[in-house]
């Protein structure tokens, strides 16, 4: 007789292999086109007690997605779905950042010389078309990652009503008195011909000159010191700024010395300058810095007077203690000159980084050489400036240091004083508090994941300068203010500002270029158009994205959750970017942070921790992963990774993740296949079923806590360990006998099936936020006992296992582990082929009290007896209890293979009963 036909073998159509690259796009299409899953998610949780929404940090609408985009969007999706599968009402509206230099540069490259023939509006329309093209590309690439959101109505910063709301945010800040216009040194990209914000600057290594230059003191300064000759020695790494020198800064109340070479240095730095060879260190005179205040030295390049000032920015950690001060080229320089009442700020450099006619107009270089410098790029001028210094150049060398570069052009930037618009950090306009104070205070109400995030953004807020928000480009939201022609005073009349905002809503911000002052001016404004002119700068794109909370969460244009947002989630670089710009705009307008929680993730690196680059050949593209492995593997990689630090990804790592996925899939497949004939879930469980349900409850409860705390790596590793070690490695392996060989309705079989069904029903919504494609596929094949009323994955809600069994299992499983160690040796020595050949003997009354079949199944032997004096194959001791392995003297049952049959060739008692019942 072929007993195989009498066994209750597993049966399911759920495939062993997911064939993910082929099947995911089909399922994605059904989610968006047929089943309208995002709308379903909204309606399913319409009456939920809790709401949750991540406000999407907008990616830039340029280029294809890279692995960093995938990490960010998948993590947002996992968190949103975690809240959803825990029963909360969720919203996720994706967005795009559309304005800015990169798109404008792309358009300029395509246009070439034709750009000169086009109007500003025509260029802006080409920029708009470029952004629209890549939004469509990125939209499909994001959706393919399994992201569920309102992709039918995303926010875009270039939409007309959005531009109007960005402008309204600017107007609100202006009304608060926090918007100021002034000449001030700012980061300037000469390559892009525009000012830059701090967030638009990256640091790279750059080789520069290090020079020490002598400025001879004038007669008044010499008289003050009571000497006949003295030279102040300054140190600088920017020789090209020396023509614009206006002062020399000293540290207040510090001791300075005049050496035998008639050179002046700060005394604390004298030893290091001796080592450099600038001086022998012989001191002729000591004096306090304050004695030189408001006296002068002579700039050797132009014979202009350079005034001695006292400033706390002068440090004793390098240089000479005398700081070259050019207020047009440095922020500290600017502020100290402002404090000393300087009326004129010299700026001899144009927007392209070339010396301009200011050199001649203010005699900043000698008359015999100045013409050769006008039109010369400042970085090319360094060597020539050094030559002009002659004997006043005391020392020159080159060194490499970290230097600010433009994030888009990748060219070194400069500090350049220009007239710009700023949001003031230290004006007490917010109920007597400054923006800095309010922003810093609001951070205390925000929860950070990881918690160190508050220190990073807090220190940045503490130390940041005023925010320069103006740019001298075309593609952006205009700083659409009128100013009086006669006084140049900007006009912030609410009626005028709102009239412009309404025009932007209807026609877009292009109207600022297309329409005349008369057409843009509100009727009955009280002003005449002929007396007004337009401000033609545009806004920093960080202001665009920093005001998205206002345009998205505070408007009726989007169903995106409420203000403040439950969460902002971006890479750790956004502490100085979007998190900060959003905080400043929100606190400036509402004195409130725009978010309740901030979660940051690290960057993606290769398996060696190296940054990815095409030149290194270590780039992992999400599109390639989807084609080779499937998106689900990428999603599981995110779920398993510790996002609080940099995340490693490579071909080898993806193979490891694929193996983990295979284990999860096969475990679920086994569960489905073995509960297919279960109609009702029982409540009467045997010892082993109580044990696995107790283990599952504890693990699932802990994992769900981890997921709620966004610790996905810990939660998923708990689940994987449970699935592979406890569930598959022990329980399911043990249960195969009762599942396959018991009678269909035997209490032991139904008890095991019920435990498996309970675990499966809790497991699926727990892993669904990450493995959404897979869980949705499972629901296509799951039997009714698992599905219940659910039609697909999005009908599921996580429910904790409510069977809390506390089974005393330490001795049992410690002895089981030791038993299998001996079994491995017995099999290696070919003394046995299967554990079913064996009987285990023990002195433990506790183990012998268990049901006889259960205790035998736990060790996967044919029986467990009381310890005897019979000869064994091996023995061991656990906690004082003895265990002995002996060969069974019974016969092998040809149906279940247990050695429980009385006669060779006959079936055991259990199998005989089953066969009799079905015959």
Curated annotation (Swiss-Prot):
Binds 1 zinc ion per subunit. It holds the Pfam family tRNA-synt_1. Its cofactor is Zn(2+). PROSITE patterns: AA_TRNA_LIGASE_I (PS00178). ATP binds at residue 614. Zn(2+) binds at residues 893, 896, 908, 911. Signal peptide: none annotated. L-isoleucyl-5'-AMP binds at residue 570. This is Isoleucine--tRNA ligase. It comes from Campylobacter curvus (strain 525.92). The lineage of its organism: Bacteria, Pseudomonadati, Campylobacterota, Epsilonproteobacteria, Campylobacterales. The gene is ileS.
